[in-house]
A protein has these predicted regions:
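Hydrophobic/basic alpha-helical segments
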Residues: 1-275
Length: 275
């Protein structure tokens, strides 16, 4: 549920009552359908911009159980914090990935390059790529933490020292940097949405650019970039970042009809831009 700042629209008591009413409706629906709401797993997360003070709403009631607000919650393997800066998620990914790298390092000399690369992608790269479209627009210092993980994996795979520059290594491995991999994921989602092969809740977030009169840009398959505020929040939204990245592609890439060909073309495009 979303609310405007309490001073403009509603008081915190009204916000609390609306949330509790929503939970009550959910509980009633579940009861009618022979289900039960697990209050022990019910969590409350109050989201707010990092430049605004935290709302004083600290708890609500779910039936008779008092649910206190959490600093962060985990959903489908991703940690969300109250300012959506994803700090806990980034730190969790880095901790787990470095743990896996330390263990993989003990068996590196026993495996061939091809077999060890498979392990790197299975235990490390998969963690960096999981839900990484949510990391779009994060501060550079957070993305750099994830880049350190990829750099360490590249050095371990290629038997190179920390003193050697990482860019030639990533280029030789043909690995896109972490920030660019995020762009790759978003562009794939935009392609699916544009061609109607994405879920409706994703497709509904993009709008094709259709000028009212005939223009040269009419045939370029551009998307509308919504008006937005704040680089740290508005521009991070898929409805904004997706069209911006899509419109920056070359015309021949946007005109691609198949997903497999599109993936190859944007990887080549992003790789050349990165290196």
């Amino acid at each position: 549920m979303s609310f405007q700042p309490s001073s403009y629209i509603v008081t915190l008591d009204e916000v609390r009552s609306k949330i509790e009413a929503c939970v009550s409706d959910i509980n009633e629906w579940m009861t009618d359908n022979k289900l039960k709401l697990n209050n022990d797993k019910t969590e409350l997360l109050i989201l707010h911009a990092h430049h605004r003070p935290s709302p004083s709403l600290d708890s609500v009631y779910a039936d008779t159980e008092l649910i206190k607000a959490s600093e962060s919650v985990k959903n489908i393997g991703v940690w969300f914090d109250k300012t959506l800066l994803m700090k806990k998620h980034v730190n969790s990914v880095c901790k787990t990935a470095f743990y896996q790298l330390r263990h993989l390092a003990t068996i590196r000399r026993f495996l061939s390059y091809q077999h060890f690369e498979i392990l790197i992608h299975a235990f490390v790269t998969s963690r960096l790529d999981y839900c990484n479209s949510l990391l779009s627009g994060l501060p550079q210092n957070l993305l750099q933490k994830l880049q350190y993980v990829q750099n360490a994996a590249a050095r371990l795979l290629s038997f190179t020292q920390k003193t050697e520059h990482i860019t030639p290594i990533l280029k030789e491995l043909h690995w896109l940097p972490v920030a660019v991999r995020i762009e790759f994921k978003i562009l794939v989602l935009v392609f699916k949405a544009y061609h109607g092969i994405a879920p409706h809740y994703i497709s509904d977030m993009i709008t094709k650019y259709e000028p009212t009169r005939s223009l040269r840009s009419s045939s370029k398959r551009l998307l509308v970039v919504p008006r937005h505020n704040l680089k740290t929040y508005g521009r991070r939204a898929f409805s904004v970042s997706g069209p911006m990245l899509w419109n920056s592609l070359l015309n021949n890439i946007r005109e691609t009809e198949t997903l497999s060909t599109f993936k190859k073309q944007i990887k080549t495009f992003l790789f050349k831009r990165s290196f």
